[in-house]
């Protein structure tokens, strides 16, 4: 038995398959053990390891450098705040699958919840989409011009090249570029108006109100712009409260894609006074991204990511390369649902360089406020209860009704919000009244179009205004086809000359097929003229009610006719928060009728509680440039009005930019750098130097002013005509600002060959304009308009007329050259750039353009004349400077641009007279007379030369005073 067993074993061992069987058995046991270890013993650890899917390197933004004034005062800096960010997390896909919804649905739900948390705790989210909903429920854009066009291009994905587009695609492109705010909203909400295949865009459920949908849309749009950077976060809100932080952290598991972090935001001191110099920052746009990253690789330290903050204007923009901090990076491990679970490497972001300006911020702020007071004083002096403004440019008055309307027309009072959810009872009452006024106006318009036989010129002022509005609206809406109109047509000419009414003209236009009836409710193209006319009037009724500006047009006319009172308008200032009721005695007095609306406006303007910028009447703007005579460094570059750069930089006030962009006072426009004006009589010192150097006059040459210069046709008049100045030398001519004297200089410059040739005279004037720095930009680092030296009529050009046109900063360069006797600088507002350790990176040294070697007696004669402008008995402004303790020299100037508006007021000056330190250039567009500019400059010097105690006292004066009535003299 045992023997048989051994034989079987021996036989089995001799079998070759046994070894393989044993080997496989051992391997199987090892495999089982290994699986046990991996799944049971180390299972949890490997489960975690399994989620480590992607390594990604992302950029982190650097810290922006600071901006300082010449005395080391901080003008722009960074403040560390808590922010809420949103990221297109892959977890939304998981949630959508789990909840059987869509990714968009889940994203919108989270964003809506976060916005509610923020608003519940008093925080404001960033609105990056330039659309707002008014109180009456209408959509409107908050940007205009090129910025609005770019927004539409980004939204619809519109390129600039149209060569490969079909006619249908071109038509769609045109529709998209002309899309209304509501159409853009609907497109972003659900894809309406998109090209084929664009999908649902953000697919925002109809359960959300329009207001909530717009808030969701704003965040989604920001993320959409960063769609090519999967791990890029977009900021929802900056500077959130501790309550919001606590609530968001507590609910973090319910809010995928949401994160709380710290971020530096830009803060500006003295923001309004320095707005046009320092500028502001904002999130980079696609064009800027392309520009700044040109020639760079993504790994470069100075490469810009799509959420970078960049300079948008002023020094912030011009010195972006210095102020911008180099980017850092983080190497991230991202799990299979897109969550960042680990940071493996951090490269610290850099800090930008600091910039020091030549601007004295204290001087800048004082001069800005001074200019505002002086402009307010001019307006105060011209306010009248009369309905007539007069016609004399030097005495044009401002009817108080114009001021009432200006509060509405210039957007200080927002009619669209009278019926908003938070509207007061008084606002709702006024909303109903304005609706009734609209209905009344529409009835008047319908009657005028359908029944009136009167010619335009015999209609009332109100009906004429409505006729003008209707005509422009029809052209704007392309119902009246202006391109089809035969402008030589007799009936059209009768309409233009006011000999027929609008109704008669439109009937004629229908017959001539100048009216596009496709937009009218006309079923039969063979309808007669009256049927089409009725359809046109019906169309107009709806179009006017939908138009943004119809309410304001009606209000203007109803104010003029007394149907809407000044008191009703002024009370809205309190209801809409422009003025505060608390502590304001004027409120109760106005409400009760104890204070009339004229005196109310007068008092508020005097206290600058209502400003010239808000009214937007003539004048409402101005500029002052103060330049160091010895270096060409600018100490103050003031442009009024300015704006609050903190509101623009924060990104939370979407309506503020629209308010600025549509204001008639043009606060976004840098008056000092871009507003070109004829220099007027401030050009006469240049003409004097040209005449002296070319030998057509000497310092002792006398010219007899007879008032009428008849060597040219038509004759040119001296400002004193029909009176005259009599015999004057060059210094006396500058003092008296005698046109006749300088007409003769211009004539003699063109008559050097013995025969008068205007072109020859212009050649010499241009020669000295070039030498004195007026033919080129001033050199200031912020950019400016191109100057223009006159190329027509040397006689009139010699007194600053013709086609001479310069900006205030260019005129400042010119008067600085006059003050220092011939040193022409490139002006500058920059002193230096330093790194974080204070080491100088770049120094902006004084740059001389040229040195003019004119004879001493020529300088003496010109400067003596400018001094006599301040002290002489023949000067129109010398009485302003009586009793001043400082010695200055100056020259007045006025320039006419529009015969229906006041003259521009200019005054150039420098001081002290014998050893000049500074030049001061003052320009007030539509400022009536040069005496207003001279009075402003006088107070600039008063502050500049004052001691500390006197400066402090002057800074406390916050009240405007009526401008004095000064005789014209230039």
Predicted regions and their residues:
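Active-site beta-strand/loop architecture of penicillin-binding DD-peptidases
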Residues: 65-68, 263, 267-269, 275-293, ...
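Conserved catalytic neighborhood of penicillin-recognizing serine enzymes
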Residues: 353-354, 398-446, 450, 668, ...
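Active-site SXXK
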Residues: 34, 72, 111-113, 248, ...
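Membrane-proximal periplasmic segments of bacterial cell-envelope enzymes
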Residues: 1-605, 614-623, 629, 746, ...
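Mid-domain, small-residue-enriched loop/turn segments at the edges of structured enzyme/sensor domains
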Residues: 621, 716-722, 756-795
